[in-house]
């Protein structure tokens, strides 16, 4: 876990963005007591357990540092898991920027390379003349 030593010139507020497919999350990180709210709801009360676990990964990895900030996240678009991954990316980027910690950044990159970079995959668009992106009529050569 990263040490709790913080640089003297920590920013007062950090705004970070995370994206996954069409889900976009904007996180506002400020000094506090460890409160995390997603669209106004506390993270502990989030209804979907898998999404809650995915969103709490950056906080668990940060350890004691996460208890020194309050995080407010607004997320929209996509499905519930896409939103969870977008929140996770926004929180991880924001914590690294807030504490300006190279150690925390390396910890996140070792745990999951996509926690800071994001996932570049997007949905392939539908082509004209066929029902879906790649589906075609079956051919029979008899």
Swiss-Prot record:
Q: Where is this region: Disordered?
A: 117-142
Q: Name one GO cellular component term.
A: cytosolic small ribosomal subunit
Is Ribosomal protein found in the keyword set? Answer: yes
Spell out the molecular function terms from Gene Ontology.
Answer: RNA binding; structural constituent of ribosome
The parts of the chain that form a coiled coil are none
The family database entries (Gene3D superfamilies) matched by this protein are listed as: 3.30.230.10
**InterPro entries hit by this protein:** Ribosomal_Su5_D2-typ_SF (IPR020568), Ribosomal_uS9 (IPR000754), Ribosomal_uS9_archaeal (IPR019958), Ribosomal_uS9_CS (IPR020574), Ribsml_uS5_D2-typ_fold_subgr (IPR014721)
In what ranges is there compositional bias, type Basic residues? 123-142
What are the protein's UniProt keywords?
A: Ribonucleoprotein, Ribosomal protein
The UniProt entry's GO biological process terms, in alphabetical order, are: maturation of SSU-rRNA from tricistronic rRNA transcript (SSU-rRNA, 5.8S rRNA, LSU-rRNA); translation
- Identify its protein family: Belongs to the universal ribosomal protein uS9 family.
Name of the protein? Small ribosomal subunit protein uS9
Native organism is Pyrobaculum aerophilum (strain ATCC 51768 / DSM 7523 / JCM 9630 / CIP 104966 / NBRC 100827 / IM2)
